[in-house]
Every structure is written in structure tokens, then in C-alpha cells.
Amino acid sequence: MRFSKALIAASLGIVLCLFGPSVSSGSAADSGYPRLVPPGSGTAAGASPPSIRFVTADDFPPFNFIDGSGLITGFNVEVARAICTRLAIPCTVQIRPFPLLLDAVRENKADAIAAGVADTPALRRHLAYSVPYFREPARFVRRWPALVEPSPHSLSGKTVGVIAGSRYADFIGDFFPAAKLHPSSSEAELFASLKSGEVDAVFTGAVGASFWLAGPVAKGCCAFSGGAYTEPAYFGDGMKIAVAADNTALKGSIDSALRALDADGTLADLALRFFPESLY
């Protein structure tokens, strides 16, 4: 995911001050949050483990961070806790520097990683991955009142801001070929070009965009425009819990819990808690 942790950390502090621990209003029923876990996907569940030792990092808001009380929280962390609640087992969440998370599992100091560790062929030599519990969509953001539905026709000849060399730039080039790409080197530069009118729209990840829209810099200038884009070939297949490659029993229990948490709206409710508005 490409977004500025500094931008989100600053905006998250403001949002938490304004709204308290639950940073969004509404409910799963009206959030538009999609079902992420197809019924029957993943590994079949066996007997639940007696407990789960999760590890995470503390420097990736709003997914895992230290709150104002000095406690670890965030979307990833609360998903981990919800898994244990669903399985009716105790769990712990320990903090490690991100580069040491894999070692914690390999050395049997932890059972599972809840930190958005990438699912790559190299890491699959050591890790197995749960079904996805979160996908960050891509979204268009435009200035008020120019919030017309984005389409190849409506954006023909328009300037669309993207992060240079990103998957978002690739997507616009492939599906909106008549749009003019305006590359930026950072999210701050990208959103500044939108607010100033240098570009007609930006296309980027919904997480960073949602925090910018809710923060003090945007000052209500802009809003999401159109729907969410989730094509896995461009935007990945989502965040997953990672366990030891040979721990199929634990993977099965986690997959089962995530299927249930998706079906009953818990994942959507947690997304509403940690993001300023629906990402979809």
C-alpha cells in the first residue's frame, strides 16, 4: 500500500480527538463495505488452538499503532483480537520491529503475524497466509463541485494526478488512456496538486485519501468521486494473517474465524472504527 504514515498519523490524532476511539459513524449495514471472504474459501477449520500469540509492529497507523493510553491497537490488532473472541480462546499481542516479525514465528516465539506482511513466493517458503480480511481499494478524488462519475469519456483530456511509477498510474494508463497523467513523487504533493487545481482529479489508495479528506489540509475542498476499484492484478489481494508454513491447523482456525467475522459484519464495523469514512 502506498500512503504516507506521517500524513495518516497526524490525521488520525485529529480524528480520534474529534470522535473518540470509534472514528467513524454508521454501521456495517450502511457502509457499503464488501464481503471479502467467499464462503468455503481458505483452509477448513479443525479444533481451535488453546491460545494464539500474535505479533505486530507499532508504526503503521491506522493498522497497528500505540494509542494515547500507551496500548497497542489498530485495525490489524483488533482483527486479531476479534479472531480470538470468535474462537473463544485467549490471545496475546506482542510488539516487534517489523523486520523481526518473521523471525518471531520461525523461532516459535509467536504463532501468527497481524501486520500486513506481504504475500510473496519468497515468504511462502516460511509462512502460510489466511484468507484476506482487508483490501484497500483505489479511488478517484476530485474537488467540489466537479464530482461527475469518472469514466474514460468524462476523463478524456482531463489531468489525473498519480504517484509516479505506481500501480495507480498503470491502471489509469491501461483503462483511461485518454486522460493526461500528472505524476507526483509523494502523497503530499499529489493532494496539493488537486487542491490547487493543477489536476482535475487524483487516483490513489483510499486509506491515505480518506485521512487527507478528513484532515485539516483539505479543508473540505474535495471528496471521493465514483466507486471503488479493487482489481487484484493492480491492487493486490488484500491483507492476511501469516502463520508458520506448516501450521495448517492454526491457519484453518483463523480462516474459519475470518469467514465468520466477515459474514456477521465485524470486519466492516472495525473498518468503520479505524477509517474516517467508508473506503468504498
Locate each region found by the language model.
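Bacterial N-terminal signal peptides that target proteins for export
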Residues: 1-11
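Bacterial N-terminal signal peptides
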Residues: 9-19
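Membrane-interface motif at the C-terminal end of an N-terminal transmembrane signal
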Residues: 21-24
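Proline/Glycine/Serine-rich low-complexity intrinsically disordered segments
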Residues: 15, 26-280
